């Protein structure tokens, strides 16, 4: 009985999603990535207690959020953003970085803006996540000092990095 209920729920959700994504006006824009490209945000300005440092990598950029005074260098958080592997990092993730910093008693938070599909299909995002991890190693952190954090697609990347 539970299995059939899940199947019914699954069919309902799938049907609702198909109506939304197949809509002639919006569906094409979602599938092509046009809707995602038009989402423009102003640059995020960190609270006064933080430095936000941009880092250019070969194929992507990263931002390192750190306290201006007395950062906790014992650990670092590698935050991998969500977005279904199709969305760029959003300002909300820098807000999350500040929360991670607070909850970890001042640890730095590195947030890569990894390459996304459809322009950069798999394994581009994973390669960029791995490059971010290796960058932290090159800065003197050991693997056991790097805390992975991610939601949605970022959670998948975090799990893949652990493998």
Residue ranges and their predicted role:
Residues 49, 59, 106, 143-145:
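A generic structural signal for alpha->beta connector loops
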Residues 73-83:
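Short beta-strand element of the alpha/beta-hydrolase
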Residues 1-69:
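A glycine/proline-hinged amphipathic helix-loop "lid/cap" segment
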Residues 85-86, 115-119:
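Short strand->helix junction
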Residues 91-111:
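Short amphipathic alpha-helix adjacent to the substrate-entry channel of hydrolases
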Residues 62, 78, 112-113, 120-163:
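Short strand-loop-helix active-site module centered on a catalytic nucleophile
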